Amino acid sequence: MKFLAILSSMPFESGEIFDSLKNISTAKIAGKNVYIGALSGHDILMLNTGIGKVNAAHSATCLIENYPVKGLINMGVGGAYPESGLKIGDIAIASKEIYGDEGVITSKGWESLKKIGIPLVSHGKKKYFNEFLLDKKLLKKGKDRIPPNPPLKKGGWGDFQIKSGPFVTVSSTTGTQKRAAELRKRFHAVCENMEGAAIAQVCAIYKIPMLEIRGISNIAGERDKRKWNLDLASENCQELVLQMF
């Protein structure tokens, strides 16, 4: 038996998927609750990581070290960068994950780990610095399982768009338009979050295929929470994930 792991930072980001699991049992690893169940014939592990890179990396490592994990889906909400073409409620699928903070600040600006020659992960001649390409086969498999106009449990599919592109993982969410424009220009990214690159790094270490999907809850740089919609973002993201099974 091999498992597909589904991770989200907070319970509200994956509650609908949890409710869809059959034959649920619970285990505890390093103080974390791991939920084991079945979804459309697939053996599933679910875990809420908590916010941030360390929580995310620790959670992914706990699962991979204790269960035979064949693939991992990281999901939740995220902030879209201006000029990404995404709006609140849309879905972003990561083509790659990028650490947005790791590197060095010089008098000439930010430089990546590759620029200073320090890899995060090495597999022989293959070296990973700030960027981790996500699994193309799992990405294609996910896209291929989405019908052109699939019905959703809570409304019409045409209410949002799905777009793939680079994600940036940050330690501090972007709260100014200047910073949002800077990160968008530097990485050509569509979406930011606080966990994805850390999970992608762990998956690279263990050679586990990974897919990341996020619902857009806000526009990065916009701190007026009255304009955010966490519920819509998480609902749409979960509906898309469920369509893949």
Residue ranges and their predicted role:
Residues 1-61, 66-67:
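N-terminal short beta-loop-beta anion/metal-coordinating cradle
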Residues 220-245:
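His/Asp/Glu-rich mid-to-C-terminal helical/loop segments that flank catalytic regions of hydrolases
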Residues 82-146, 159-186:
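Mid-sequence, gly/pro-rich, charge-dense loop/helix-turn segments that line enzyme active sites
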Residues 70-73:
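Structural motif
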Residues 170-212, 221:
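A C-terminal functional module that forms or caps the active site or interfaces directly
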Residues 154-157:
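Glycine-biased, low-complexity coil/linker segments
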